[in-house]
Amino acid sequence: MEQLNNIESIYVQNATMEHRKQYAQFFTPLAIAQLMADWLLGNDKMETVLEPAFGLGVFSRILLSIKSNLLIKGFDIDEMILHEAKKHFEGCKSMKLMLQDYMFNDWNNKYDGIICNPPYFKFHDYDNKSVISEIERKLSCKLNGFTNLYTL
């Protein structure tokens, strides 16, 4: 299986490195995405999935190719990448894509599964400091400046 499929390859060619760095965009290799999707679908009762760092939707593309009746909600903060992703899910009624920071949204919804490869940057590099205090409040804990999205 190739490292990136055509969708990711085209995006990488068209988006500047500066833009991709700004949003900490590094794409999950298909073999790893497939492994993660297979693991998630090991739950026979899987009906709803959250993909909070949607990007181009590699996980959702794989999940829906295996189980087309899943209801998936995806979030991304980059309008450019979400615009590209929406082209590939056009007409897919089981997909809801949001141009929002999932860190501020969806706290009250529940999902059967969550799948993502969050952008890797430390909170001290994060430009929306109010997110940190909101997360600390909701989780009742203090995060240090070296915490990254993988921790959450």
Give residue ranges: language-model regions.
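S-adenosyl-L-methionine
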Residues: 1-42
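SAM-dependent methyltransferase catalytic-core segment centered on the flexible catalytic loop
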Residues: 14-19, 23-24, 40, 54-71, ...
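Conserved class I S-adenosyl-L-methionine
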Residues: 45-55
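The conserved SAM/SAH-binding core of class I Rossmann-like methyltransferase domains
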Residues: 75
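Conserved SAM/SAH-binding beta-strand->alpha-helix loop
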Residues: 78
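Conserved SAM-binding loop
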Residues: 85-86
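Conserved hydrophobic residues forming the short capping helix/wall of the S-adenosyl-L-methionine
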Residues: 89
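Short, conserved active-site loop motifs that form the nucleotide-linked donor/cofactor pocket
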Residues: 95
